[in-house]
């Protein structure tokens, strides 16, 4: 017997109330700087120690991407698992290896790795000190769509595990279904053939008009085929800053070296200053003007910037046009002549 829901409230009233409650809830989740000392690492069933900077599982919910830190002890091999989302890793300290679909990638400090969706992967450490790395994933985005799935296979060898989900190949024809099959097959093949490992020394760091030097760690420009996740190393010369700009969230900046502060405000001249140091995570989680400063007059500082602009922001820009979603204060940009006068520290990993 079928039933019919009875309500005397209009859909307009229901949605208006729900939307008001939703935005108020998320305003209460907003963050600025997550301190390293506030992130507690705990042993996990995978054999790692893990802490959450940003994400549902650390009681700091997000919409697009998360930020976690992991440690793998000497002689340890984690369990093998896979998930419906992708992730990027940044290696903070020590050395180790990550196996992706049966291929081992040895890494050391400041290397980066992309973990494609549905790829079996695990981590290990053959060294004599713990390896430490950050992970940033698109899981929150998949969660909003009801498509977050994870599968842990324990210590089963890769050769015994099922492959990534199968897909139908393209077929001839110009009808909508044939065209969809070909389009999706082509995209899937491309996504499954991207770069996995980026050794830090492989890319050159270059000066930009924003007043800093940068290099890609993960990005489609260097061959990664991610969900839009990108990762860039930003080097600040002593006492220098980056140009003032704004864009929608979410974007994280992990403090790799040094100390400084960030301005964040709803207008270029009205906001607050937030101090940070090595190991902290700077959070830009909504549409704010922001600018980052190296407060050390003698030494460089380094931030690693992470966001999903290639997918989330580009979609938002398309849907919101002609509203401008990425702006820079042009009077804070640096000329090429000014850039040439900056004395940049060498671009070397720790210990080199």
Locations of regions flagged by a protein language model:
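C-terminal functional regions that serve as terminal interaction/effector modules
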Residues: 6-13, 250-256, 262-267, 272-352
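A short beta-strand-loop-beta hairpin characteristic of the jelly-roll/cupin
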Residues: 77-109, 119, 246, 250-278, ...
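Conserved metal-binding segment of the jelly-roll/cupin
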Residues: 73-75, 100, 107-127, 133-139, ...
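A short hydrophobic beta-strand segment most commonly corresponding to one strand
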Residues: 88-90, 114, 128-148, 252-253, ...
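Short, low-complexity cationic-aromatic patches
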Residues: 57-62, 78-85, 104-106, 119-120, ...
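Eukaryotic modular interaction domains in large regulatory/scaffold proteins
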Residues: 212-213, 217-220, 229-233, 251-253, ...
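A short, N-terminal "cap"/entry segment at the start of jelly-roll beta-barrel domains
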Residues: 1-63, 151-228, 331-352
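Conserved short histidine dyad/triad with adjacent acidic residue
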Residues: 49-56, 66-82, 232-248, 286-287
């Amino acid at each position: 017997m079928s039933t019919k829901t009875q309500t005397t409230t209009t859909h307009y009233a229901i949605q208006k109330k729900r939307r008001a409650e939703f935005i108020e809830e998320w305003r209460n989740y907003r963050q600025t700087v997550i301190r390293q000392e506030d992130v507690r690492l705990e042993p996990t069933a995978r054999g790692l120690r893990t802490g959450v900077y940003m994400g549902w599982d650390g009681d700091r919910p997000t919409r697009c991407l998360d930020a976690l830190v992991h440690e793998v002890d000497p002689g340890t091999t984690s369990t093998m698992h896979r998930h419906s989302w992708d992730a990027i890793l940044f290696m903070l300290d020590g050395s180790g290896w990550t196996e992706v679909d049966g291929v081992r990638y040895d890494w050391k400090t400041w290397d980066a790795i992309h973990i494609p969706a549905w790829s079996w992967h695990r981590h290990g450490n053959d060294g004599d000190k713990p390896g430490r790395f950050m992970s940033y994933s698109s899981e929150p985005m998949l969660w909003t769509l009801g498509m977050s799935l994870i599968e842990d296979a324990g210590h089963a060898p890769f050769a015994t595990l099922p492959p990534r989900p199968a897909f139908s190949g393209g077929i001839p024809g110009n009808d909508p279904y044939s065209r969809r099959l070909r389009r999706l097959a082509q995209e899937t093949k491309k996504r499954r053939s991207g770069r996995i490992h980026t050794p830090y020394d492989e890319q050159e760091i270059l000066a930009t008009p924003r007043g800093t030097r940068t290099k890609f760690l993960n990005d489609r420009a260097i061959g990664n085929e991610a969900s839009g996740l990108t990762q860039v190393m930003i080097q600040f010369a002593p006492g220098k800053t980056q140009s003032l700009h704004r864009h929608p969230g979410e974007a994280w900046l992990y403090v790799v070296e040094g100390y400084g502060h960030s301005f964040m405000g709803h207008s270029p001249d009205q906001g607050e200053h937030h101090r940070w140091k090595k190991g902290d995570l700077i959070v830009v989680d909504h549409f704010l003007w922001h600018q980052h400063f190296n407060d050390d007059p003698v030494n460089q500082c380094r931030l690693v910037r992470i966001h999903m602009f290639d997918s989330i922001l580009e979609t938002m820009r398309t849907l919101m046009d002609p509203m401008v979603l990425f702006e820079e204060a042009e009077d804070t940009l640096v000329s090429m002549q000014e850039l040439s006068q900056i004395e940049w520290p060498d671009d070397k990993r720790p210990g080199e």
